[in-house]
Amino acid sequence: MTKYISLFGATTTDTQVQVVKENQVIIGIGAGASRKRYVVYKVEHTARGYVYHMVDTETKEISQTDILRPLSQTFGIGRYYDDVNPEFMDAFEVALLVRQAE
């Protein structure tokens, strides 16, 4: 089991708990409050917890992370999932994005 503790945000993230599903849209918040949209195309469970494989919907860049936080608890730079109104993309659209990214 892996737990990440944020000293600044006073939050804990348990990677053994799956927080999003495949085809779910993720919001990336960067420097200067810039926003990117990612979509999860694969959820993998490893010995260290869940790993989310995603693709940027604009640049088609593939990335992965094991830390996703709820959008309702936004605190600085990071990747967030909408825990109130989750958004999903069509599986066919996601497959096309992944193919373009590879």
List where the protein language model places each region:
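Short coil-to-beta transition motif at edge beta-strands of beta-rich domains
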Residues: 17-30
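Short polybasic amphipathic segments
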Residues: 2-5, 54, 78-80
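Basic/aromatic-rich interaction segments and small domains that mediate binding to polyanionic partners
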Residues: 44-64
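Intrinsically disordered, low-complexity, charged/polar segments
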Residues: 8, 60-102
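N-terminal start and proteolytic maturation junction detector
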Residues: 4, 23, 44, 71-73
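Mixed-charge, Lys/Arg-rich low-complexity intrinsically disordered regions
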Residues: 2-19
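Short beta-strand-centered aromatic/proline hotspots
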Residues: 36-44
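Short, charged beta-turn/beta-strand-edge "cap" motif at the junction between a beta-strand
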Residues: 31-35
